[in-house]
Amino acid sequence: MFNSFGNIFRLTSFGESHGKGIGGVIDGFPAGIVIDEEFVQQELSRRRPGQSVITTSRKEADKVEFLSGIFEGKSTGCPIGFIVWNENQHSNDYNNLEKVYRPSHADYTYTVKYGIRDHRGGGRSSARETISRVVGGALAKLALRQLGIHITAYTSQVGPIKLEGNYTDYDLDLIETNPVRCPDPEKAKEMQDLIYKIKGEGDTIGGVLTCVIKGCPIGLGQPVYGKLHAALGNAMLSINAAKAFEYGDGFKGLKQKGSEQNDVFYNNNGRIETRTNHSGGIQGGISNGQDIFFRVAFKPVATVLMEQETVNIDGIDTTLKARGRHDPCVLPRAVPIVEAMAAMTILDYYLLDRMTQL
């Protein structure tokens, strides 16, 4: 259950980290959208492993194969099926995990819940599942482009190293110029050096991604239980290793008074706008036409290459030292995943909004 995401635009994903492949079926995608398969592949390449010295060394082409729902380069309105074949599994790296539980992983909870688990690379709980999300998000981005909606995410903090400014203070075109995907070149170098150092110690580190949605029309959101920020929060917190979500000023706004936090309205040549955007583009659970921006915190990767205490499947105390190929920090590869989940959420809520009035 619960392997599907969305209401009208709906992605159902399938597959495991060391199975034959990862795939999905997308229902509710509008007909007539030009499908740029090269763009979809580029998005997957941003997520794939082995991009740099600060990511996992697992080598996968992650080539997407579309199976249905596209004809002569356009969506038909029928379900879009796709698959990405796994090619570089090293399942033997996980033989020592068959009868022990990795600290802070899903091993124990999956075993208790289902009575069985795939110990090879985490199985269904692996972040490799997010391949399906990136494909779905890439298709959603293609549709949103036609509406003038654009989504950009970037690394804004790694461990103690953080960007102090708002997204408006940076040139977001610089995000893809460094492996950390940070728009501040100096901070990016510091972040990269820290990740590399942590990797050398066999440890991991977390941080924060910031995401900005520009061009979102007024009116997206379905109060009271389908508020737009709640939907975005649900989408982000469904990503592996995501631990917290805040939009607008978030917790920072608690330090101010209401008179300081309020986004006052004014008439800008016939268009009602706000002079500030503390609300993060959402008021009353509905988009107000301003930029939507939010932050997602990711914990350090649970797999560390050092000995740790744990228990085996019989509940007996033991120790475990992980092997295999793992990310020392998820943030660089999580950037396209955050964008994908945001894109699918916005497209879904755009389609829902078309049902609000006759």
From Swiss-Prot:
Homotetramer. Coiled coil: none annotated. Keywords: Amino-acid biosynthesis, Aromatic amino acid biosynthesis, FAD, Flavoprotein, FMN, Lyase, NADP. This is Chorismate synthase. Belongs to the chorismate synthase family. It comes from the Bacteria. It comes from Bacteroides fragilis (strain ATCC 25285 / DSM 2151 / CCUG 4856 / JCM 11019 / LMG 10263 / NCTC 9343 / Onslow / VPI 2553 / EN-2). This reaction introduces a second double bond into the aromatic ring system. GO terms for cellular component: cytosol. One of its GO terms (biological process) is amino acid biosynthetic process. PANTHER family: CHORISMATE SYNTHASE. The gene is aroC. Its EC number is 4.2.3.5. InterPro entries: Chorismate_synth, Chorismate_synth_AroC_sf, Chorismate_synthase_CS. Pfam families: Chorismate_synt. It catalyses: 5-O-(1-carboxyvinyl)-3-phosphoshikimate = chorismate + phosphate. The keyword Flavoprotein applies. One of its GO terms (molecular function) is FMN binding. HAMAP family: Chorismate_synth. FMN binds at residues 124-126, 240-241, 284, 299-303, 325. NADP(+) binds at residue 47. Reduced FMN (FMNH(2)). Its cofactor is FMNH2. The lineage of its organism: Bacteria, Pseudomonadati, Bacteroidota, Bacteroidia, Bacteroidales. Pathway: Metabolic intermediate biosynthesis; chorismate biosynthesis; chorismate from D-erythrose 4-phosphate and phosphoenolpyruvate: step 7/7.
